[in-house]
Amino acid sequence: MSELADFERLIAGDHGLCVASTLRPDGTIQSSLVNAGVLKHPVSGENVVGMVVRGGTRKLVNLRADPRMTVVVRVGWQWVTVEGSVWIVGPDDPVSGIDGEHLRVLLRAVFTAAGGTHDDWDEYDRVMAQDRRAVVLVSPDRVYGNG
């Protein structure tokens, strides 16, 4: 049985790239390529898989209706899957106790956990606000794979 540390190790091996899957209202699966990383949940302190998602996407619509996600990372023949419930915070998904400044810092934390770097953080913050980006955190219920 794999652990979240295995996911974290593999995700670093491919620039944070992984496949995130949600359920559409008709029960079919919607998958997309995302950048993700492992970080501490800002409220619970548990280790979670985090990603930044553009506002208005099908992924966010699906997650609001059914807040569960599967994330798979693969490097070569090694892979790890994380399944779990999600927590969303963003301009269109406010959370009590997470103000605009906290969201700005959290967006940066998720981006860097996914291996991201930026030469102009003010520009990064501007784009995140303009795109109404949200933070999606997956709390692992099941972790499995061969990695």
What residue spans do the PLM features occupy?
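A generic structural signal for nonpolar/aromatic side chains embedded in well-ordered alpha-helices
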Residues: 10-11, 63, 110, 138
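Structured helix-beta-strand junction loops
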Residues: 13-14, 65-66, 130-132
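Short beta-strand segments
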Residues: 15-55, 61-63, 69-73, 81-85
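Short, basic/aromatic recognition patches
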Residues: 1-19
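Charged, gly/pro-rich active-site loop segments
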Residues: 78-147
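Hydrophobic alpha-helical segments typical of transmembrane helices
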Residues: 3-7, 59, 106
